[in-house]
Amino acid sequence: VSVYYSDDQVTLYHGDALAVARELPDGAADCIVTSPPYFGLRDYGVEGQYGLEYSPAEYVERMRALFAELRRVLADDGTLWLNIGDSYAGSGYGNHDINGDKWKADAGLDRRRDRQQKMKKALLAENIPPKNLVGVPWRVAFALQDDGWILRNAIIWSKPNAMPESVTDRLSSRYEFVFLFSKSRRYWFDLDPIREPLVAPPNVKGGLFKRGNDSYVSQATGTRQGNWDGTYNEHGRNPGDVWSIPTQKFPGAHFAVFPPELPQRCILAGCKPGGTVLDPFSGSGTTGLAAQRTGRKYIGIDINPAYHDLALK
């Protein structure tokens, strides 16, 4: 565990996420926003990396153990935003297919074949034969929930520009999950910065909203004063749990880069102004960029120093 870079706003650690987390003090982060390597998708060529476990159960347990430690590091009123994608069991080429041709570009042939065979056996042992959507996101979410995390939202990240897939016997994958967890029943959350702009309809008056023939209720006094009620919010409407955000390319980045708008939205809602955001899988630093843009401090962890170099450019 070593500090790779540090200034008054950013601290980057080089090392295994769990090992670094164990060295961090209690309550060091106000918010965690992260996207771990997906199960079985790609070999980044770094010993000890997440995502290369032989079975979903092993992957889920590593996630559970990591976030159990990070729960200590998170402030009592903090939130965890976890973006995680799914995988298919099988031998065919496709988006997030396990044991598929994508491994050819990621590892040596012998290593790839050995891992394929071990992973196939492990999947069959868990009663997940080829062609199955493994359901990794929900397996992880339920494991964290069983471990004491409070699952508040299962947000759909819809990708309007998702990459096409060469599959003909199922629909293309065009979304991923972003799970919102809290450590405690009462936590810091601000909906206003992420509200969607709303043009006031003609039946809005003084912050009150008309709904049919019902009388309205004054938000200030609680008294009925006509045919209006207080459901209209001048800051906009609740954005809901389906977020349509295009993917973006990051020159020189590793494969899994989510668009800055995604972590930025999580940070605005889930991290108090001036607070500290933590990403245990910092990668090319997208979460760090979002933290910087929103005036928060940042702690990033990655097992590959090359990604820290990329983030610092």
Question: Can you say where each PLM-predicted feature lies in the sequence?
Answer:
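Core catalytic lobe of class I
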Residues: 2-312
